[in-house]
Amino acid sequence: MNHAEQMNDLFQAVQEGHVEKLKSLLDADPELANTENQDGLTPLGYASHYGQAGAVRVLLEHGAEVNALSHSKISYIPSNTALHAALAGERSPEVIRLLLEHGASTSILDSDGQHALHSAAFHTDQIELIEMLLQHGADPSALNSSGQTALDIALERGNTSTASCLRAAVAAQ
């Protein structure tokens, strides 16, 4: 199997959650855990985006860098971490919890200048995710590259539950 075929198999296994296939590929070539595809996306970011908790777990067990920044070549996908990808994609609480428990940083900026909490405030009104990020060190007063807080973004997006949660977090600081 050539490298291109390996990468296609890897990203297909990741997207579809084929854990045994993924383990087999990583056992044969552990470096695949941190190899970007032709679009500049990481396997961990891809699995996180698609909410594939089993694949995320396997990749982390095989040494995937939890805070690695992708180098996206796709115009509408910023270069980001797996945590950003999880928040912009399926928003799986299990995946986000796994990433945070494995040391995912909430303070890394993606190429759009957003912290994880800003991404969450933009994409979701799920309090559970906001609280997880706050419990793992996300700063509710942090500014993105445009000078906005996550609360500003939540209010713009009409994510009222998120806004209430962030208001309380700012008040508690």
Model-derived features with residue positions:
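Ankyrin-repeat intra-repeat helix-capping/turn positions
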Residues: 17, 51, 90-91, 124-125, ...
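Intrinsically disordered, low-complexity regulatory segments in ankyrin-centric signaling systems
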Residues: 1-29, 34-41, 45-53, 57, ...
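Ankyrin-repeat-protein effector appendages
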Residues: 1-10, 102, 136, 145-148, ...
